[in-house]
């Protein structure tokens, strides 16, 4: 139990008080320094007066710094919420994902009250599950139960697995025959309903028996029946099948429920020596109520962890030391500019203490990983501190949200603040990324936002790209009226049109070549649109609606642009190709500063396009071809600056190998924009065909057409890292 915080400071003895200790140490130190010259303790002695005021201030600061850490993570209008700081409860961190047959069994039993038993089988050769269920005797249409099972399965489906058959199980009906006595005052109808519910619950796959593999026997059942409220004793008690008493009960056993008085002929209830009667309608009503409430009470519940709450303290105002000094020193504590050197000395004390309190005040927002706190204004120091805290969270959860290879190319100009936001977004989702990394796309809910395989979400969150499956990357450049030109893949006519913009190296006089300086551009979205429109008007190469892959990729680096002064006192904005020789004339003019600004705008424009063109697709062939279980096809674009680099591809491959479940194999394909356009079309058609049983052959054809596009991939890697 937390200690009760009293609304006052506990009084200490004079010897234990911090102020007394500080003052004693100060005076001893001053006396040692002064030697034979000593003070008379008058106000005109600034040393002693200052020590008293400063020690009082230090005592107050010590009090303000003495609260439990959790209190400093509470704000006046916001309580302590561990998730805000990336401190997730154990049930989220260590909660098990749905993997085994028992996991699915628990899931269905806790989610569907209309079933009492079920059998789940898994075929490793096809990756298919089969479910047979026993429904309760009271409610539930079979078709609705089948639909619920399929819905719940697909919400929790793992990669390269699928649900095949869902059907009603063949059951063995048992009949209850008994003669027993109840206590006086008990309602016989209610007691009989309790007895039937006890038998039903024992025969069902309740949460406690899912993984226990216990054999159901008459002995165990009778022990439970004797504990039923209202039952005094049993004279006879049998579960009968075809007139034969049963000693063991199979998993598919179900209990016959009486619906009319004739069904109760083999059940006799006594109260004392008097035979009592049963109200059959009331019996059915009570048994139905017990069934519903019993399933609810026995559904799996996760224990709640008691969390500390913390308490906010109004401790952030600092009372200047100068206010405690005599007026004869003529100090100005409320003025920013000190009146004297002594005043400046006092200001320094106050600055240190005030700055410390301000750092404590911003602590909740500094350590927060919530999106709502993204408006926090960062400095160079707070960025360093925040990164240190995020590094701590990385180690806590065993991930790396800031791999070194991701920083090598600055992620298209990602600012330190943007890098923090990317890391925070990744860490906000760390529990589900770790726990559910095998989780697949829900093929029944294709239009639902956020419905993506977990390995895609992990990859995209880590490198900072859009994880939405509806983001069509092959449409990005056409949307901007641009055609990407890869020299080795287009006609000689197009190449000649591009080459007409090139200038040979020998025409570049080094004395006339200048670097392009960095220009600060507007961050306003409307201003950016206007800048891009103006850029397209002023740079002639946009008139062709063509862009070389070299310029598209390497134009993201400002050092590849140059300003060249021509003979007629004009300037040309030049781009130096990296992937083949030559310079490209992007535009010209008499004002060098305008060309520099255009180069900066073009670089930012290309960075945004590159970033927008990056994604990852996950294909599960087994959903179209049952002969290919445990196989994944992972597809990425090959035409962006980062995704075109060999080192970046290798690091992405290592990352994917680390997050893809170990039992799965497959390949990673890096494909061109042209191939991606057809691939995305086939991919979305394939998704829509998964749930249509009449399109079995069509699904295989779509998968084949999709793999034809992958056969010509620029680079292929394997997910199998066993070598």
Q: Language-model segments: what does each one mean?
A:
Residues 177, 194, 201-266, 270:
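Membrane-proximal bilayer-interacting regions
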Residues 561-583:
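Short aromatic-glycine-(Arg/Gly/Cys) micro-motifs in beta-strand/loop hairpins
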Residues 1-49, 95-215, 224, 269-528, ...:
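Carbohydrate-recognition loop of C-type lectin domains
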Residues 1, 684-691, 699-723:
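Hydrophobic/aromatic interaction determinants used to assemble and anchor large protein complexes
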Residues 30-41, 46-89, 176:
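Single conserved position on a long alpha-helix in the C-terminal lobe of the eukaryotic protein kinase
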Residues 530-569, 600-601:
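N-terminal segment of the canonical double-stranded RNA-binding domain
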Residues 133-137, 250-251, 574-580:
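Secondary-structure transition/turn motif
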Residues 530-542, 578-597:
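A short, exposed loop/beta-hairpin motif centered on an aromatic-Gly-Thr core
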